[in-house]
Amino acid sequence: MPGESIIPELYMPVTPEIVTSMTDNPGDAVETMVERLEDDHYDISDADRDLLLDLDRQIRLLGPSEFSDHRHEFLLRRGLIIAKRVGGLAAGVDDRDAAEDIVQWINTEQTGSPETNKDYRVAFRTIAKIVTDGEGYPDAVEWIPGGYPDNYDPAPDPTDMLGWEEDIQPMLDACLNSRDRALVALAWDLGPRPGELYELTPGNIVDHDYGLQVTLNGKTGRRSPVLVPSVPYVRRWLDDHPGGDTDPLWCKLSTPESISNNRVRDALKDVADRAGVEKTVTPTYFRKSSASYLASQGVSQAHLEEHHGWTRGSDIASRYIAVFDDANEREIARAHGLDVEADEPDAVGPIVCPRCEQKTPREKDACVWCGQVLSQTAAEKVEEQRQTARNDMVGADEKLANALATVENQLGDDVSLRIEGLDE
């Protein structure tokens, strides 16, 4: 399995002062970097400093319709890292030799994944295009490849994916509070980008006919996917949340003060450790796992793109469909004369309590809201516990046992009043 890291590998080669600001809101992170550039805080050349400040000005002039806060921060940060680690950023915009030095560093010394290195190459080319005011890329950078190495296999590995039954449910059982349960369930159900996950507020979540609807403002625009299996856990945290609609969703348990992005990642890792889940549990892997589950259940590429905020015809979405949708294999088997039937989707969504009509986790024996037992097995278990307790009571104190029997006769068959300890 891939190694675990609290800080995503995209930021691994950077110096501590850069890592510190990367966990903030992207708009705030941009302001911090600009202030430090203006104060000559960074150990970079004057030419590179001036170019980065010009980059910031040009992005602000083009406005949010062209560059979101995330994209603004993405370009400015990578430009700053190149200026610090290699230098010659300003020269590389106009000079092929200087540009080659930067690309060589990206390809050989910038110790990231193929995706990370691609991001740096694309960012470098885009920076050059923005600051030269041209219609296209300057000659010095136009040649820079924006793709992946020939031997790069971007297909998701099924063994890395987090499954609801084998991974998510044990993590939910290992959580110590309603916030962490909501975090685990929502991250898998919604599959948001890390930045989208961190920036959620209670006001982003509203009721929907099929569950809860979440409004996200991602890099491809606004979308509003629907939560299903995570609904009971998210509702419980919304009830327990100490703040209002505009406060951070992921806050401290007793105050609406935001917890850091690092703390959100730590919470996932801590829960996984307690549950014995050894797979990578970063927000990115929750996103990948969400996509893999939807693809495996026959969700179309168009719907997967809409749910995860990918552009139409996305190569990423098509990879998940190719790896996890077994429709092609079924058709080939059918062509060879086998009697093949499509598997029924795995049931992971919540069930509706017949008493209070709230959604409760499918795996629970009793409604988490009103205590109503939800299966014959659960009812029998409650009755068995009651009989055992009554027998013990008779042996210890016959008068108290008779009093208890009187109370039970008044309660009748309403075992929900006794269900509190059933799952303990």
Predicted regions and their residues:
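Short, basic (Lys/Arg/His-rich) helix/loop patches that form interaction surfaces
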Residues: D245, R265-E306, W310, S314, ...
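Short, charged phosphate-coordinating catalytic segments
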Residues: A187-D209, Q301-E306
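C-terminal secondary-structure termini that scaffold catalytic or DNA-interacting sites
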Residues: E17-M22, R334-E424
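Basic, alpha-helical nucleic-acid-contacting "clamp/cap" segments
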Residues: P2-P13, E17, S21-D28, A123-I127, ...
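Basic, Lys/Arg- and aromatic-enriched nucleic-acid-binding interface segment
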Residues: M161-P194
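Catalytic-site neighborhood detector that most strongly recognizes the C-terminal catalytic loop/helix
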Residues: K219-T220, H308-D343, L374-T377
